[in-house]
Amino acid sequence: MDQDIKTVIQYPVGATEFDIPFDYLSRKFVRVSLVTDENRRLLSNITEYRYVSKTRVKLLVETDGFDRVEIRRLTSASERVVDFSDGSVLRAADLNVSQIQSAHIAEEARDAALMAMPQDDAGNLDARNRRIVRLAPGVEGTDAINKNQLDTTLGDAGGILSDMKDLEGEIHDYIEKFADDTALVRGVAWVYNLGSADGGETVITINKSTRTYAVPYIEVNGSRQEVGYHYSFDLETQQITLATPLKAGDFVMVMTTESQLPVETLLASSVGASSIGTATGETVEERLTRLYGHFVHPETYGAVGDGITDDRVALQRSLDVAYENALNGTGPSTVRWSGDYMVSLNPNSLGVSGELAAGRSALCIRPGVSIEGKGTVRLDPSFTGSQSGAVITNWAGPVDDCSIKDIRIYGGKDVATGTGITGILILDSQRVVISDVKVLNSTAGGIYLRKGATEGLYGCSFSKVSGCTVDNAGYIGIQMERPYDNTVIGNTINRCEDNGIDVFGNVNDATVTGIAQSTLITGNNIRDVLNGVFIESCGNTNITGNYIADFRSSGVIYNRINSAANDNSLTSNVLIGASGASAGVSFKNSVGYCTVASNRIQNSDYGIRCVGGGITGLNILPNTMKNIAKTLLFVEARNNGLVKSRMSTQFYEGAQVGGIPSNTSPRGVPHRFPSRLSYIVDIQPFWATEQGTREDNFERAKGTLASITGWGSKCALYDTIVAGDTVVSLNSSSVAVGEYLEINAEVYKVTSVSATYAVVRKWTGSDYTAGDYAAVIISNPSYIIRRVQWGEQ
């Protein structure tokens, strides 16, 4: 290869590893190919070659059929690698990455030109012993001709020779002009002495207002004069010395130039970016000034952004500078992270009681600072221990009006030695915005807005988490502690070992509702978690329009630790459990005053589950349920399990088989927590798509006891058919052992049946007792048969 070529190198095949002799900004700008004179094959990174180091690649494929390996740099001219910071000075000695990208593009363009058909040392175009293919026949006298045209006209050798001589002269003129004119930026033509020479002049002084750096050529009366042959130019004196004196009246035009710097040198200079135009009409300098001035870049402070080097100090410096700018109004307060940054835990990070252990956090965001830029922050996975910390947090105090947007945070969950590090943890701040952030593989939580200070009621206020992704978290996906007017909207949460979204507001007072105000959780997609949304000892939350699937316990759960979880709303959500899931919605430990409406609940043991007792004030409006294994509304077997509540008719997709799913847990069972549902509880039967209105409270059948002639036209006998027991006129085809009969508001248990009668014993306050009940079971009374489960669940 020509040694002037800097961005392309070819090696003979035979080895497997090859050096990359040039620098590059990104691996995607490097092309590795197998080549011959007639063929070329571009290789794919990872599958056909890989990087041994930053400056060396290794082939993973055979080279049969090829004789050379080519490594070429091809930098994107449209994909900007980085931006510039406000007020930066562009010098060759300290070019930033973006300037280098511009220089790379220009360098590759020059190499492409040289490789296409460069000049040799004599100024001739050099095809380098390669054919020029697909050349059209020449038309004009100065056109090149192809072999067919030459063969056709070869008979007229004299004419051909003459044409070739003319062509040679024209090409020589062009090459000479191209070789001599090294300027990139030309000035306008300058006319000597108002267009008329005095005569006899051999020296002309250029008296332009701007300095001339070169004179590529001059014309005397239209005849081109070549530098070095017809004249010379002295840069210091600005004088042209002519080989032949001028004649009186000669018209002399001098072509001047503002710069004689090579392209590479010019682009590397402090004015290089101002010499490159863009499609919008701006120069690169103008464009970068307009964009770069809006951001603080960690690269300005030494960040490498290769995903390997520890860039924590540079990233923290960018945050601190942005904070200083926000305080003083002296520059941008937005930090742009666009690289791939490795960060270690900061051993000097401060602890916050109950939230952060000292030395367990990496970066401290500051008030009024925004982070954005599609960059990646990777936590160095070599950390140990399990104390709580965070990749990005605010150990120095509240960070009102901060934002974090459009970055990725990798926590190293699957490779880290230690645990306990949350992706983002913001404490005690107002107007916090976290949007379009991806927190992946966290060893603890994903995104937390919590309360750390001992004073004040609330944690973070007037804040929003939107459009974020939390995947593979070691604990909770998104958590808020004591929120005030916070919104969690449009997030994707997947694979959390605990809750998808968690709202915590407990206070040590059992007489009050926990602390939370105006919390909206909407439009989130939550999957593969323990519980989809967990409302812990607080109220005033609105959970609506979320898609929660593959939860292992409950889709949504309301729980009390000390203070209550009251005054909540749960509407229009899709709640689909994983295999073995407990309930679509759970209420636990004296919580309530919640409206549950228009939700789709599917694939769980229970549709709605109430445990712990004292669940109060549930307003369960119509919901759609499907594949409920046991009960639509389960209430734990204890008195006052559910009080002052109602359930409207639920819509069930499917059929009830053998009383399953039941509408509710048993109600009014005299021997088993008769006040399980108490203090005005209204329950409506559910409606099934396959059967219409279904049985309620395990009511399997009802009817009227028939009189039997052989029994003296009675419907019940005592101590006649079965000694010491009462029998009624039901038989084994209508009732089963263990079922219950309600007759005249009394409850009887069926203890045996035959083809003609059923033996019943009455609940007498402590047990089902044998006795004479025929005297009260008269006049063909109505009866209700309730299933065995009614008395057992």
From Swiss-Prot:
Any one GO BP annotation for this protein = symbiont entry into host cell via disruption of host cell envelope
One GO cellular-component annotation of the UniProt record comes to:
virus tail
Q: Name the domain of life.
A: Viruses
Q: How does it assemble?
A: Interacts (via N-terminus) with depolymerase 2 (via N-terminus); this interaction probably gives rise to a branched tailspike.
- The name on file for this protein is Depolymerase 1, capsule K47-specific
Q: What is its main location?
A: virion
Q: Where in the cell is it found?
A: Virion
How is activity influenced by pH? Optimum pH is 5-8.
The entry describes the temperature dependence as follows: Optimum temperature is 20-70 degrees Celsius.
Question: What is stated as this protein's family in its record?
Answer: In the N-terminal section; belongs to the Teseptimavirus fiber family. In the C-terminal section; belongs to the K47-specific depolymerase family.
User: Quick check: keyword Transit peptide in the entry?
Assistant: no
Keywords, comma-separated and alphabetical: Degradation of host capsule during virus entry, Degradation of host cell envelope components during virus entry, Host-virus interaction, Viral attachment to host adhesion receptor, Viral attachment to host cell, Viral tail protein, Virion, Virus entry into host cell
* Purpose: Functions as a receptor binding protein (RBP) and probably mediates the attachment to the host capsular exopolysaccharides. Displays a depolymerase activity that specifically degrades some K47-type polysaccharides of Klebsiella pneumoniae capsule, which allows the phage to reach the host cell membrane and bind the entry receptor.
Q: What is known of its domains?
A: The N-terminus anchors the RBP to the virion. The central part and C-terminus probably binds and degrades the host exopolysaccharides.
For this protein, the record's Gene3D superfamilies field holds: Single-stranded right-handed beta-helix, Pectin lyase-like
Pfam families in alphabetical order? Beta_helix, Phage_T7_tail
